[in-house]
């Protein structure tokens, strides 16, 4: 109790409400109730080709983000409020939670797709691993001293090494072409694998080894290539990414047009428009601070500005269509100003 000349003055001190009480009041707030209805409407939308689960999650996150931005603008324009700050905090936590769920779902999707691609690639790798040891075993069984003393060992080794190199590279190319034909046609078609003629003195021995090599390759390739005729090639998964979907030309623009036609919200952000109005008033009143403007007056100015801009763009698009164009250009807007806005400097 304080005493002054005019008499005693009583000052009352109130305890701030508890967090639980504030939460109960926030749950019954009209903005929160309207947002809950909007959220349920998004969740109850049926599945279609233009709306998948990932798009629905992104739409929910955007709704949280827009609501938080709206409250932050109110916090900037008006006095600080504990209830509003608590609502911003709660909705921010909810938005982060939905973003975490969305990221986990995306990671799980790509993990499953990689596992599926790996399982499709496994039969091809196993068949290649089976063929490699057979080739190595056949190479180790070749007897390079078959001709005895009449054959030069060094000369035979060099010739055999170059011949084996060209033959192995040719076999690799033919094996790849045969694998491609397996995936397109079930019937095996082999190219002629006749070796190049050799004009050295050991021609008969080389031809014999090449024939044996070709027969072994035919047997190994036929035995390993018959079962996996029904396998799928790697990279041909039917699962596609949802957020990289291709749209037809103009589809996104039409969706945005329908969205803005259904909404009754302002298209210009409130805070920048208020700052612009204050700046214009300050310039016109020679930087004096003796002015006030009501919130409904600002709303009326914003509605008038949006109506004027919409009408101007409608006329400019009509001029653009008259010129047999679909792209709006600055000359269309300038022509509209000359025709319809002569008094506007």
From Swiss-Prot:
SMART domains attached to this UniProt entry: H3 (SM00428)
Region (H3-like): 263-340
Disordered: region residues: 117-246
Record-annotated site: Cleavage: 128-129
UniProt feature, compositional bias: Basic and acidic residues: 122-149
Superkingdom of origin organism: Eukaryota
Location of this chain's protein in the cell: Nucleus; Chromosome
Compositionally biased intervals (Basic residues): 233-246
Keywords recorded for this protein, A-Z: Chromosome, DNA-binding, Nucleosome core, Nucleus
Disulfide bond entries: none
InterPro entries: Histone-fold, Histone_H2A/H2B/H3, Histone_H3/CENP-A
CC annotations in GO: nucleosome; nucleus
PTM: Cleaved at the onset of meiotic anaphase I, likely by separase sep-1.
Family assignment from sequence similarity: Belongs to the histone H3 family.
Subunit structure: Forms a nucleosome-like histone octamer containing two molecules each of H2A, H2B, cpar-1 and H4 assembled in one cpar-1-H4 heterotetramer and two H2A-H2B heterodimers.
The protein, known as: Histone H3-like centromeric protein cpar-1
Taxonomic classification: Eukaryota, Metazoa, Ecdysozoa, Nematoda, Chromadorea
């Amino acid at each position: 109790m304080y005493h002054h000349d005019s008499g005693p003055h009583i000052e009352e001190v109130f305890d701030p409400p508890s967090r639980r009480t504030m939460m109960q009041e926030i749950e019954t707030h009209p903005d929160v109730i309207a947002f809950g209805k909007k959220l349920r409407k998004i969740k109850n939308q049926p599945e279609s080709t233009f709306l998948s689960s990932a798009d629905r999650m992104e739409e929910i996150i955007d709704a949280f983000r827009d609501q938080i931005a709206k409250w932050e603008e109110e916090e900037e324009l008006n006095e600080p409020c504990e209830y509003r700050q608590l609502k911003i905090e709660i909705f921010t936590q909810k938005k982060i939670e939905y973003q975490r769920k969305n990221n986990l779902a995306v990671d799980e999707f790509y993990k499953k797709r990689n596992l599926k691609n790996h399982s499709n690639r496994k039969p091809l790798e196993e068949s290649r691993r089976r063929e490699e040891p057979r080739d190595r075993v056949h190479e180790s069984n070749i007897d390079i001293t078959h001709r005895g003393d009449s054959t030069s060992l060094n000369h035979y080794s060099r010739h055999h090494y170059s011949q084996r190199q060209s033959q192995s590279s040719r076999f690799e190319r033919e094996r790849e072409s045969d694998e491609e034909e397996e995936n397109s046609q079930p019937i095996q078609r082999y190219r002629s694998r006749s070796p190049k003629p050799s004009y050295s003195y050991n021609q008969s021995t080389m031809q014999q080894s090449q024939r044996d090599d070709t027969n072994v390759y035919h047997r190994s390739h036929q035995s390993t290539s018959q079962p996996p005729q029904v396998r799928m090639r790697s990279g041909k998964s039917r699962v596609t990414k949802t957020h990289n979907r291709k749209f037809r030309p103009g589809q996104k623009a039409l969706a945005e047009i329908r969205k803005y036609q259904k909404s009754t919200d302002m298209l210009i952000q409130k805070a920048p428009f208020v700052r612009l109005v204050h700046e214009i008033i300050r310039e016109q009143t020679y930087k004096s601070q003796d002015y006030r403007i009501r919130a409904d007056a600002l709303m009326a100015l914003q509605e008038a500005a949006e109506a004027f801009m919409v009408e101007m763009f409608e006329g400019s698009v009509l001029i653009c269509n008259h010129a047999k164009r679909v792209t709006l250009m600055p000359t269309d807007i300038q022509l509209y100003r000359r025709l319809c806005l002569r008094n506007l400097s």
